[in-house]
Amino acid sequence: MLLAKRADMKGILPLSVGAATTGLLYREHRMRTKAERLSAATLETLLNAIDANDAQTGGHVRRVATYALILGEAAGLDEHTLHTVERVALFHDIGKLHGALTDIFHDQSKLTPEERRAVRTHPQRGAEVLEPLSAFYPELGKGVLAHHERWDGTGYPRGLKGKRIPLQARVVAIADSFDAITHRRRYSHARSFSDARRAIAAGKGTQFDPELVELFLSPPVLAKIDEAMRHAHMPQKKRRGNRRRGETQPAPDITFRWSSRSRGSPSRDRQL
């Protein structure tokens, strides 16, 4: 009888262990899924904060995301990397929401040397804000931290050079500078598409990844960038009216991969 019970236990024990393991894995999966949803919700909240703090900055990061995705797709980046590029573009200036920097960016006067030094801390501050999400978005903070690095190693905050700069940051750097040149800032007027194109070309191999610059300046990519700019500058009411009459050009063939709310040599100040 005792031997029979032991034999039965030998059969039951593996089943019990297997069931317990399955249960633990299921609970772990549910907890991770919940944490991922909370992380995504946190990113959405941060994007809302960017909009609420400065509508101009909100428009800027969305345009940068659009241009970065155009360049990333042309470079043949895989879907995961494109997700990362988009997130870095949308949150590259999140560090500017730090209390010590908010007043500086809302002040319309020219930056003082002290203010310039303070502004240059925004990549680190942004990476710090995003650090709690690094378990789910490990490349996001790295890209935000490096978006002001330069190909020749003279950027900040760490002076990274060449391909030591994360790819997502190299892509976003070009898109960020292009948008800064073509839109009015507190310290400069908006310049033309042609001026911006020449400035990006001038930064090839010094400020920017030369291969990405070649791609950005190729006719197919520039055509998409130009189309995206026209779409972004068109007033919302006019867009709706044109769509009703069937007169509007289609929006650029770019799909935002993360945000459900997608919208539509440079001077040193322009890189802040």
Regions found by a protein language model. Give the residues of each.
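Metal-dependent catalytic cores of enzymes that make or break cyclic nucleotides
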Residues: 52-62, 66-261
